[in-house]
Amino acid sequence: DLFKLFQTGDLGNIDKLDPEAAAKLPNLAQLKKALYSDEYRAFIREVTGCGELADKTDCACSVYAHGCHLLCHDDVIGTRRVSWIIYLSDPDEPWTEADGGALELYPLLDAKPHTPHVNPSARHLPGFNTCAMFTVTPGKSFHAVQEVFARDKPRLSIQGWYHAPTEPEGKE
């Protein structure tokens, strides 16, 4: 399978919860408000150089437990423009290479354009309160989440996509 993980529904719907349920999630509602703000979108544009962003944002929480993974892909679906991940793993138990669960970035094969290499060129461990982001580019933004080897140490994150007003050129 392309993936094995546990994921919530889209956090864009958090304001549609009944008041009793919403009262249990005030911090998540504040984070969603910040991530969806015009100011944060301007920051994303400045940092990534991604160009114009639409108002559309996707956002969900994910848990990768022992054995969970996400195979190599490029995130090109519809108008996705910037992929981002905020890591929320336990700060008292820093993530190590032995735990697995790294974000893997893949270079392209020289002989075959738009084809990722078999091996990643970089691995980034999910450090607490860190954010990874990259521009979604057809045939280039290949990445994966390495299988989680740790038995009692879940890889927790909030992740999503900022969208462009139109679909990218070169999308197949």
PLM-predicted stretches and their roles:
Residues 14-18, 55-58, 119:
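Membrane-targeting and insertion segments and their boundary/processing signals
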Residues 59-68, 72-80, 87-172:
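Catalytic core of Fe(II)/2-oxoglutarate
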Residues 1-46:
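Non-heme Fe(II)/2-oxoglutarate
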Residues 4, 16, 24, 32-33, ...:
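Context-gated lysine
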Residues 7-13, 51-52, 111-113, 125-127:
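Short, functional N-terminal and low-complexity linear motifs
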Residues 31-35, 40-46, 50-57, 62-67, ...:
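Active-site-proximal binding-pocket segments
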